[in-house]
UniProtKB/Swiss-Prot annotation:
Keywords: Coiled coil, Intermediate filament, Secreted. Residues 192-510 form the IF rod domain. Residues 193-227 are annotated as: Coil 1A. It is found in: Secreted, Extracellular space. This is Thread biopolymer filament subunit alpha. GO terms for cellular component: extracellular region; intermediate filament. Belongs to the intermediate filament family. It comes from Eptatretus stoutii (Pacific hagfish). It comes from the Eukaryota. Residues 511-643 are annotated as: Tail. Residues 1-13 have a biased composition (Polar residues). Residues 1-34, 622-643 are annotated as: Disordered.
Length: 643
């Protein structure tokens, strides 16, 4: 069975149990009328959203598409929006069909809704008790939904998008926008209920007052009637009036006496009550003042103890800071001396810095604990003494308060003395506070100075480190320049030695009268080769070709002139003019010195290595660098002359 209910939220869900499907369609609704029903239709913001019918599950618990009636105009067509799976089938009456609910309910009423509603709800109207069809908690008459077309029959299954919708809306259609909101109706009903309750309460109070007044009035009437009505006694009304007046006068006199006595007693009671209240108030004030003084005394003692402990702690911190400052100064001086020794190049000395931490080794926690225990004992003792001294005074004051104003005056004097003592204690506390503030200010200044000096020392150390790095770089550069100059000096010494050797050999040859052989060759040739055996000398003159090769004999020397282009020789240099010095190296493998070695010997090697200054087999190039040898043509004339 399909049951539709209307709530304030807008959403739709479907549940399938066994073979029967139970569909709940919930949407924003408007309530009209009054009364409640167990079954029936629901009137939503879009019209009639559901009617009662039968449904059967087919293929799952719910549908994922959109369902609608298949056929002509129907009672309700719903476009759903909840994502569920499967389809359901149903047996519709008057255009009822199963729809796959998927949220976003949109109810559209067909033109035959009135007749269908009348036909379907006829079985339930008898249970409700009238032609009205209730919606939610309020009633609505089905005449709001007149029909202009006959009933229609829905198909057994809901299609993916539903069938055609019904005809135009009937003339009796009510726009939900014109209906009041449920919140407004509910608020109005609550306010009316509260007003009715208030009026009922006032009316009940008035009724009670009227009843009370009526009862009092009846009593007064009875009394008046008893006094004024004549009695049936034989004496007659005259004697009764005389007796009543006599008794009334007597009673009135007694009443006046009693009233006077009552007034006097009340006055005396009020006077005594006033005195008692004054004494009680003064006693309570004195007790309160005494209690306040005791509390202030204890508080002041605790504050003084705490202040003293704070002062001791601050003094300890100041001593520790002084020692730390001295230690920092010693470390700084040691570092400055180390840096100065490193910069000036003096001997490195090992410094041992010894810091005396004996004062800091004191167990401050134990000392503070002992001091705290000592002062707690003193505070307890002082509190007990003060209580012992004040307790008798309190008792005396309690006794003397009842004695009279003299005791009050004495108590005021004692209070004045206590106030003076409290003022002195307050002044002492203020003085200690000011002293504590000054000490804290000094500590702050000292800490600031320490931080400032530390920053300055750090900056000085960093600048000294930078200067030290610059000096190290300069020393490295000076060492490199010194090595270069030393290599140059060595090369010059070697060249000077070679020239000296050459000059000594020439002088020896001239002094011994050695001969000189001059050979001239014609044609193109790579160079001349000459050898002087023994202690003789040979001179080979070669045109500027690839480069000559000279072999010096034992004890002799070879001289090559105008070597061009760069040549390869045994102990021969590259460019320019080279001298090969034999003897001591054997087989012509002597040192070769180039005259242009100081000018970086173009094409030669570096100082002390490579071709310019190396002995043995080496590759050297002249200024032109591996240039092609020049071909020279000369006359075929050869002459030999011995001096």
């Amino acid at each position: 069975m399909s049951i539709s209910q209307t709530v304030s939220k807008s959403y739709t869900k479907s549940v399938s149990r066994g073979g029967q499907g139970v569909s709940y369609s919930q949407s924003s609704s408007h309530k009209v009328g009054g009364g409640s029903v167990r079954y029936g239709t629901t009137y939503s913001s879009g019209g009639i959203s559901r009617v009662l019918g039968f449904q059967g599950g087919a293929g799952g618990a719910a549908s994922a598409g959109f369902g609608g009636s298949v056929g002509g105009s129907g009672l309700s067509r719903v476009l759903g929006g909840s994502m569920v799976s499967g389809y359901r089938s149903g047996m519709g009456v008057g255009g009822l069909s199963l729809s796959g609910t998927a949220g976003l309910p949109v109810s559209l009423r067909g033109v035959g809704a009135g007749k269908a509603l009348h036909a379907i709800t006829s079985a339930f109207r008898t249970r409700v008790g009238g032609p009205g069809t209730s919606v939610g908690g309020y009633g609505v008459n089905y005449s709001f939904l007149p029909s202009t077309a006959g009933p229609s029959f829905g198909g057994p299954f809901g299609g993916p998008f539903g069938g055609p919708f019904g005809g135009p809306l009937g003339p009796g259609y009510i726009d939900p926008a014109t209906l009041p909101s449920p919140d407004t109706v509910q608020h109005t009903r609550i306010r009316e209920k509260q007003d009715l309750q208030t009026l009922n309460t006032k009316f009940a109070n008035l009724v009670d007052q009227v009843r009370t007044l009526e009862q009092h009035n009846a009593i007064l009437k009875a009394q008046i009637s008893m006094i004024t009505s004549p009695s049936d006694t034989p004496e007659g009304p005259v004697n009764t009036a005389v007796v009543a007046s006599t008794v009334t006068a007597t009673y009135n006199a007694q009443i006046e006496d009693l009233r006077t006595t009552n007034t006097a007693l009340h006055s005396e009671i009020d006077h005594l009550t006033t005195i008692i209240n004054d004494i009680t108030t003064k006693y309570e004030e004195q007790v309160e003042v005494t209690r306040t003084l005791e509390t202030d005394w204890n508080t002041n003692k605790d504050n003084i103890d705490n202040t003293y402990l704070t002062i001791v702690d601050l003094q300890t911190k100041v001593q520790g800071l002084d020692e730390q400052i001295n230690t920092t100064k010693q470390i700084y001086n040691a570092r400055v001396r180390e840096v100065q020794a490193a910069v000036t190049g003096g001997p490195t000395a090992a410094y041992s810095i010894r810091v005396d931490n004996t004062h800091q080794a004191i167990d401050l926690t134990t000392s503070l604990q002992e001091m705290k225990t000592h002062y707690e004992v003193l505070a307890t003792k002082s509190r007990e003494e003060a209580f012992t001294q004040v307790q008798p005074r309190i008792q005396e004051m309690a006794v003397t308060v009842q004695a009279g104003p003299q005791a009050i005056i004495q108590a005021k004097e004692q209070i004045h003395v206590f106030k003076l003592q409290i003022d002195s204690v307050h002044r002492e506390i203020d003085r200690l506070h000011r002293k504590n503030t000054d000490v804290e200010r000094e500590i702050t200044v000292i800490e600031t100075n320490i931080h400032t000096q530390s920053d300055e020392w750090t900056n000085n150390i960093n600048s000294l480190k930078v200067d030290l790095e610059v000096i190290k770089k300069q020393i490295t550069q000076y060492a490199r320049d010194y090595q270069d100059l030393l290599a140059t000096k060595m090369s010059l010494d070697v060249e000077i030695a070679a020239y000296k050797k050459l000059l000594d050999s020439e002088e020896t040859r001239i002094s011994h009268g050695g001969g000189i052989t001059i050979t001239t060759n014609a044609g193109t040739f790579p160079g001349g080769l000459s050898a002087a055996p023994g202690g003789g000398a040979s001179y080979a003159m070669v045109p500027a070709g690839v480069g000559g090769v000279g072999l010096a004999g034992v004890g002799g020397y070879g001289f090559r002139s105008m070597g061009g282009g760069g040549g390869v020789g045994y102990g021969a240099g590259g460019g320019g003019v080279g001298y090969g010095v034999g003897g001591g190296f054997g087989g012509g493998m002597g040192m070769s010195m180039s005259r242009m070695s100081m000018g970086a010997a173009v094409g030669g090697g570096s100082y002390g290595s490579g071709s310019g200054y190396s002995g043995g087999f080496g590759l050297s190039s002249s200024r032109a660098g591996y240039s092609a040898s020049r071909k020279s043509y000369s006359s075929a004339r050869s002459s030999s002359r011995i001096y």
